Amino acid sequence: MTIALFPGSFDPITNGHVETAKKAAQMFDKVFVVAMTNTSKKYLFTAEERTAFAKDALKNISNIEVLEKPEELTVKLAHELKANVIVRGVRNSADFLYEQEIAGINKRLAPDINTVLLFSSPDNSFVASSMIKELARFDEDVSQFLPIKAAKALRKKLRHE
């Protein structure tokens, strides 16, 4: 059985994240989607909120389980979950180079775990949570980029109800 871990900040979860999770679900027997905390980022939503958005967006995919493990090293979590693959989404060459570095470090820390990079479709290749939050701050409709609950919560959080 191949178990994959798809970690992310998901602040908030985007259609690109959902696309990556769905692709992973087609490739692996079990996929853990985990809202984690990157200590170099400042978050708009709590870990609980980010997890709830992911659970809602992915609820109809039977081999995906959404968890919240905000502060843990990814490879340690992969071992806890018995995952032998870490899945990451890649939108562009900058993402690729960043993920290549992280994959190298992870391989050193956990030689038994492989990283699989899944490339986004052209429709999602420019969608970044940070960009979507910026659009929403200026009262732009971001519903085409986010799952429904995440879009509504973002609008409410920024008081553009």
Swiss-Prot record:
Pfam family, one: CTP_transf_like
Family matches, as InterPro entries: Cyt_trans-like, PPAT, Rossmann-like_a/b/a_fold
Catalytic activity: (R)-4'-phosphopantetheine + ATP + H(+) = 3'-dephospho-CoA + diphosphate
UniProt-annotated location(s): Cytoplasm
MF terms (GO), sorted A to Z: ATP binding; pantetheine-phosphate adenylyltransferase activity
Top enzyme class: transferase
Keyword annotations: ATP-binding, Coenzyme A biosynthesis, Cytoplasm, Magnesium, Nucleotide-binding, Nucleotidyltransferase, Transferase
GO biological process: coenzyme A biosynthetic process
Family: Belongs to the bacterial CoaD family.
Subunit structure: Homohexamer.
Protein name per its UniProtKB record: Phosphopantetheine adenylyltransferase
Species assigned in the record: Lactobacillus acidophilus (strain ATCC 700396 / NCK56 / N2 / NCFM)
